[in-house]
Amino acid sequence: MDAPKKIGFDLNQIAEAFSLERVHNQPELAEWLSAHYELNTMETELFESIYTELQEDGDYWNEEELKIQFIGLAFRIAGTTVKNRIKVFYERPLSAQVNGYELAVISDCLVATPRPFHAPRNPYFFLQEFKKKRGDKKDPEAQMLTAMLIAQELNQDGLPLYGGFLFGSNWQFATLVGRKYCNSRQFDATNRDDLLQIIFVLRRLKELILNRVAQL
């Protein structure tokens, strides 16, 4: 039996190895990005605090500071967590054999149904963040896409997977439906309207995952 092949975090290599098609429109992504909510008073105060810090210090944060000062608080405002049903995890390893390839990645952040002792069971959303430029060996989009392919293999439910990747303050969201991959425009977290929409998109994850779990 042949040993599984290795593949790096390279978008073109990944696309060719797994016959992925990049599409420019996908209903699942459009519906997700259209999310709209109202923030309560406490959420608004935290939102304003994050927005101010991004304006003042965001360009100088390292990856860990970005995670602590921004990403974790964004999920808190979004209210994504549901006790015993949905949790946000950080720095979790994922691996699987997919189509003869050994895939492995450490997910900077993922949203999943939880196991009893705070471990992810079924992952549905992945967020990769990086401070350097595209093309680096740690390209966050390639890492996110690798995590999505692993999740398809682990979940075995044929349902869409959701993701996001950051270059500094610029966010993009993505969906993988079967072998069709689509990503969004950039959302600049230093822009108030874009930051608010990032929060809404993260909040919408809760509904998407709860609906999905109800189907299982």
Model-found features: residue ranges?
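Conserved catalytic cores of phosphodiester-cleaving nucleases, focusing on short active-site segments
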Residues: 70, 107-115, 123-134, 146-147
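Short terminal or interdomain "cap/linker" segment that borders an active site or interface and mediates
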Residues: 166-216
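Nucleic-acid nuclease catalytic cores
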Residues: 132-183
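Active-site metal-binding core of divalent-cation-utilizing nuclease and nuclease-like domains
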Residues: 86-118
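Short connector loops at helix/strand junctions that flank enzyme active sites
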Residues: 83, 102-106, 123-125, 142
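Short, solvent-exposed loop/turn segments that connect beta-strands within catalytic domains
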Residues: 116-122, 156-158
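Short secondary-structure junctions
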Residues: 78-87
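Charged, often low-complexity linker/regulatory segments
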Residues: 1-76, 207-216
